[in-house]
């Protein structure tokens, strides 16, 4: 789960502003505070260092559980992964042992976009299962894209009978499956804002207010897609003979 400190610059995607936070304190305490703070940041005529930092009243934004919105598995396609040719230049049939090797990449790429300016600089994990049964777990950052691939290979030996003055192609083949996963990750905000008053309010100069009281909303969404391609059911196929 990703976690980082909230800043005043985050307030816009929470449908809030320093003015609206200040007004929330005014409505609650009947007096407008001189300044407000969140974590180590201050606004207006706030006490420094920030009282939220001094007294340990921190405010965080956190990523929640990944929600898989949709999964689309495309029609499988045949893929030739490698080939080898057996040749017979003689005048009678011959049985040859042919080695064939195949290589391919299982690839995964992803991209993310933030709803209404949601920001999250730290990486967070997105995990789940593809329809093919494979598990995925990628580290993503809001508004960025990336990719990874794993190279795989296979070798096989097979006996092939080749007619006179002919050639036979042996292919290593597989079934390519591609899938697109669309996901959403909720971003929630929790913690406190602080306010300092020029004169005592209910016996105190400093007051703190939770995010659900100070902000218009306390959540946002990061959306993204994961594209995955992999090869299944690898086997060898012997093609028809052809004249040399």
Swiss-Prot record:
The keyword 4Fe-4S does not apply. One of its GO terms (cellular component) is extracellular region. Its main location: secreted. It is found in: Secreted. CDD domains: parasporin-2-like_N-term, PFM_parasporin-2-like. The keyword Lipid metabolism does not apply. GO terms for molecular function: toxin activity. Keywords: Secreted, Toxin. SUPFAM superfamilies: Aerolisin/ETX pore-forming domain (SSF56973). Belongs to the hydralysin family. This is Hydralysin. It comes from Hydra vulgaris.
